[in-house]
Amino acid sequence: MKGYFTVALFYFTNSVFQTFKSLIFEKKSLKNNYWSLLLLLLCFNIWGQENYTISGTITSAASNETLIGVNVIIPELNKGAVTNEYGFYSLTLPEGNYTLQVSFIGFENIAQPLQLSENKKLNFSLNESTETLDEVIIQENVEQLSIRKPQMSVNALTAETIKQIPVVLGEADVIKSILLLPGVTNAGEGASGFNVRGGAVDQNLILLDEAIIFNSSHLFGFFSVFNPDAIKDLKLYKGGIPARYGGRVSSVLDIYQKEGNSKEFHANGGIGAVASRLLVEGPIVKNKSAFLVGGRASYAHLFLPLFDIDNKAYFYDLNAKLNYNFDDKNSLYLSGYFGRDLFGVSDSFLNTYGNATINLRWNHVFSDKLFSNLSLIYSDYYYGLLLDFVGFQYDSGIRNFNVKYDFQHYLNSEIKLSYGVNNIYYRFNPATIIPNRPDSGINPSQLTHKFANEFSVYAEAEHDISEALALRYGLRLSHFTRLGQDAFNRYQNDQALNYNDQLELYQPATPVEVQTNTGTLATFTNLEPRASLSYLINDNSSFKASYNRMAQYLHLISNTNAPTPLDVYAPSGPYLKPQLLDQYALGYFKKIRNNEYSIETEIFYKDIQNRLDYRNGAQLIANDAIEGEVLSGKGRAYGLEFLAKKNKGKFTGWLAYTLSRSEQQTPGRTPIETGINNGTWYPSAYDKTHDISAYVNFELNKKWNFNANFVFQTGQPTNFPVSQSQFQGLTIANYATRNQQRLPSYNRLDLSATLTPKNKNKTIKGEWVFSIYNVYNRMNAASITFRTNEDTGANEALRTSIFGILPSVTYNFKF
């Protein structure tokens, strides 16, 4: 062993010498020596006194389900660890006698003596409980641990909190819940998706059990695709994003499903005004294997014929999961999701869209310090449109096949390494047009399929430098290949858009050549450094800072915020460059009165390169030359976020405020070209200057629980015509610069009450949820259109609103 140590020390010393030599004497850049410096920082902490490791898995005693985010703490050393996404933890400590504390919100805490003179495997099963005095004491240590972690701009919501927040039609909803967090908005009622810190919908990486979800909305954006009964853990990363995530430039919404109860059978569900849900779970092999199956469906369309309405709008989805624990070191998981939305008008129009995923994962514990997860993932998004009155079916979509292998290496109590590799293969179908009847008059058409591959590798260290200073630093290397296709357009001077200086507008260029059976069309390689730090001011407050660069190689081609937009994903290539983000954030975090209250304040700045913009009059539907409709610009967003929370007591909740700007700029490519808005900065479609949200939960007693939330937002940017002209008897509206007007401000108050009666039948437990959405019946504008009054000939504005006041009742049950 001594010989190995001598050799290692020699190579380490030589590496240090060569690194400083290249930096100081040869004046090479820091970028070229990034990995050497990272190694240098790590190695200072690897050698020391004799240490031993405790490791294991923490589960729920009731279901054997692993628990994410459990705190394992040694208060004497102010050291601790947190269980990962599969309930595994590892903590390396000097030899000695300690107190070991295990704490997780909603569960009984464990405090026991620990005599550490050898490596130990310690598994724990936690019992559900209400808060006790011991829990408060241990929780103080937990909060001191969390406030010094080098992680910022992240929000977590439990399934219980999501179910308490009153939303439209009484259905608990993930997306509607995160809209109450600072920095998160959407385009308004009836709009799909969500926007984070001024970013677009397609700039969010949405993961369900590691599989990509391309559209997060059901039923015009009124519901999300996530069944709240099936959710185990949810985190939203808005900045300081860990190196293991990539492919999007705005945020990461990472959701894990429950695994299923391997001890006994259970079922729970709910019956609401427009939808119902049911989830069943139980053991396959007791204490070793479990299953979970959950489904939801809406049925409001069944009542429309009673009102002589010949339309339909409904959704359904299915969640399923199997797991098998072979032994303490090997576990296998198979999970999937399938969802569809259907919207039809009479028999002439039918719109169908939805996601599907399947994921096979293998967990393996190599040692008490090394954990791994191998995932094989398939996901797709389908969009279909049946226009019977025209006589054709339109289909489009995107599929991907993903292989990823992730490792978590717990070197010692100061350093945790994460590293891994990921490869995603994409297949794009822009459009397939098929006539659906003999007299259609529509010719069959297939737009060119596109193919791409995205490879990435990353490494990251979480490093406790001292009692006060903690760092997380890492690097992600991504490589994107635009693969060959059957036909590809080539343009003169590689410009797919021409500028007409007489008309002062952009027009699609005519291809000078169409290549067939092409080889690789383009490759892009990007280094994506990530860094964040936390400095502990005292036991209850800290200062944090972060920087991250991210690359996005997929583009959502859509110039509408409509609830069922005709969205098409396109890969980067010779004419569509990848988006690149640089984000900086600073924050101050404070806990008050043993974490009864907490305050989080952050400022951020985002700079985005190669942000797509559309020429005036862009034609995006069934266009095989989409590159002739878009321009490359840039974007920026900056702002302040404030979050004040009350975490304990009969009254709990939070107040969130965001002051921000989100802007785009698309200058001309030459001095002659005007670009968009004459090349000046203008508000993006996601710019909301002021965003205020408040949530309050009041637990009156064991029977009654009351909730309220309030939202106020600056109106969404929009375009109003400034004049009109006549052409061949038609009135044509004329517009000036983009997004210089706004819709009226948006505000809404929602209330709910939950009644949990005493259940005489202990087998079945139930609760009633009474909710009122939009209590004061404000008709918030979803859009404003203009028309000519037939009687007076004057122009008039027409406001379109989605919802007024909506009361609802839901019955939830479990057994």
Q: Where in the sequence are the language-model features?
A:
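Transmembrane beta-barrel wall of Gram-negative outer-membrane proteins
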Residues: 53, 272-299, 308-342, 350-374, ...
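Gram-negative outer-membrane beta-barrel transporters
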Residues: 604-607, 626-722
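Periplasm-facing N-terminal accessory domains of Gram-negative outer-membrane beta-barrel systems
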Residues: 46-139, 468
